[in-house]
């Protein structure tokens, strides 16, 4: 049975932590530690994870009986993050989700999906966005092939590469930066999409720039992707690890 029967995709684990934690940790590594999470399908799982974060990540002593007491031993470093968790609707499309968190946004802000990891330099991305002065920036990445690649000479295998990067063409890798003006292109109707409509309109108005990230990127779309990312983590080859 698929893990996403029981939890949102962003809570599927790489190693001992959800992929969502890995994404947030990457932002925090570059000095960005204030987060607003747009919750949808099984959003309560994410709320409970962060509400009980100390319990999940430290040793605990439980005293039973009349003088019941729980002591959490803070034996692990605690992330200095501020997280606002917002219920935006189970079937809401992405544009509407972003519009529904507008009250928590004061300045330029970043947006990413909850299922993609990368070694992108977030600080460089933000600098690029500030310099061009347009409303939005999207990160373009080279996707990985779904299949292993074999290099051969005269029938002899010289190299086997699991899920190599496809060098031709780039795709939307997430990791957006926006001015607050983006909210003028969104609305709170649940059918307000993000890529179809708002980003297309920004493109027509010459208000969307692309930051070409030439490093590594991967997305957890399938169980096979989960196995691949966990294998990188287990081998110490997790390119996104901060």
PLM regions: where:
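Catalytic-core segments of class I nucleotidyltransferases/pyrophosphorylases
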Residues: 109-110, 117, 121-130, 142-145, ...
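A conditional alpha-helix N-cap/helix-loop micro-motif detector
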Residues: 16-17, 91-94, 192
């Amino acid at each position: 049975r698929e893990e996403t029967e029981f939890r949102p995709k962003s809570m599927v684990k790489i190693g001992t932590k959800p992929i969502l934690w890995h994404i947030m940790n990457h932002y925090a590594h570059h000095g960005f530690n204030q987060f607003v999470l747009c919750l949808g399908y099984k959003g309560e799982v994410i709320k409970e994870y962060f509400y009980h974060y100390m319990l999940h990540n430290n040793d605990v002593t439980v005293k039973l009986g009349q003088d019941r007491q729980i002591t959490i031993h803070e034996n692990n470093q605690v992330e200095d993050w501020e997280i606002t968790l917002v219920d935006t609707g189970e079937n809401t499309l992405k544009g509407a989700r972003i519009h529904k968190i507008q009250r928590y946004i004061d300045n330029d802000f970043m947006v990413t999906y909850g299922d993609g990891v990368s070694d992108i330099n977030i600080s460089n991305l933000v600098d690029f966005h500030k310099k061009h002065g347009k409303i939005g920036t999207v990160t373009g990445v080279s996707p990985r092939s779904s299949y292993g690649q074999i290099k051969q000479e005269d029938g002899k295998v010289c190299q086997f590469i699991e899920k190599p990067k496809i060098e031709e063409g780039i795709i939307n890798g997430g990791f957006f930066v926006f001015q607050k003006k983006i909210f003028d292109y969104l609305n709170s109707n649940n059918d307000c999409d993000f890529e179809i409509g708002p980003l297309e309109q920004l493109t027509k108005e010459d208000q969307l720039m692309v930051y070409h990230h030439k490093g590594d990127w991967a997305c957890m779309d399938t169980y096979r992707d989960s196995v691949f990312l966990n294998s990188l983590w287990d081998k110490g080859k997790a390119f996104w690890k901060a």
